[in-house]
Amino acid sequence: MNYECLARKVLESYSFIDPVFEFLRHNENITYKVTDRGNNCSFLLRIHTSVTEGFYGIQHTLDGLESETVLLQELGLNGVLRVQMPVANRFGKYVTGCRLENMDADIYATLLEWIDGDTFTHNEENLDEIVYAIGVTLARFHLFTRASAALKKLNRPVYGVEKIDNTLEKLRHGVEVDIYSMEHYGIMIEVLTQVKGIMRELDSHDGAWGLIHTDIQRGNIIITDNCEPCFIDFCLCGYGHYLFDIGSASTIMESKQRDIFLKGYTSQAPFSKDSLRYVEGLILMSIFLCYAFFIRDSVRNGWIKDHVERKVEMWKEWLTGKEIYYLL
């Protein structure tokens, strides 16, 4: 598929004068930086077709995408976070359907405002300040989604017990194609069974569940010139336990920075280190979700075999009750 041809077709629904395309990446979406030479403004164009079948989900549907734009607007218009605000097309819609002549169905696309800055590298000179600010930003996001009535019933993925069962079914394929052994798969089952127990415990805690980002990684945090961390790429956002985001964010920090991150978080929202066992389990869940995204893609799943072999002993230790938060 000629992606730039598709991108140009999408932009016919917007009021660009002289667009210049810069391909960024193709993971859960095809993304381009689009700069309009007519006014020198830049935007992020997302064409919602995934690089591998494992990424596809409700987040790629019209309802799912419209729900994501609601989240971005709620965050931006209420001044909660600086986010990439959605841009309406010439018909007043935030999601644009597009189909080339050789395509059987529409592909959806969205256009977002561009945020200038650099992706978080963990090598910044003022690292402690930025890590603390990431904790603050995440807490503010969680406080808002916990309280916002507008965000309670969006059409988004759900990261609960059923998601774990679905993930385990997908991971069985890894044994079938000899990516890892049945013994390794059995340990994954044990780990995720414990995680399901953790989820049931958390469900009895007030305010433990709500709309979360789910994909906080270094490439999804932009550090602006004034050192403000901005979360981007809410494509996988959905309903889950808030500790899931704390876990994801923790793993992008080196161990010695994690307490600084947690200090930033607790400056705005409640969190106790007594919850670290829960956080560890949800980190392991996020790892297995990532395996499931790629497990059937023979071109892109080669890293999983090595990763399992390097991490399986740690999983065993976690099953015995050992703390691994600062090792993950």
Stretches with model-predicted labels:
Residues 27-40, 44-45, 86, 196-244:
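Active-site acidic catalytic loop and adjacent metal/ATP-binding pocket
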Residues 17-22, 273-277:
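A short linear hydrophobic-aromatic micro-motif
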Residues 36-150:
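ATP-binding pocket architecture of kinase catalytic cores
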Residues 242-270, 286-302:
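Active-site activation/catalytic loop segments of kinase-like enzymes and analogous catalytic loops
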Residues 129, 133, 155, 273-283:
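All-alpha amphipathic helical-bundle segments outside canonical DNA-binding/catalytic cores
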Residues 123-183, 209:
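A cross-family kinase active-site recognition segment
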Residues 293-328:
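ATP/Mg2+ or Mg2+-diphosphate-binding catalytic cores
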Residues 1-21:
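Juxta-kinase regulatory segment immediately upstream of eukaryotic protein kinase catalytic domains
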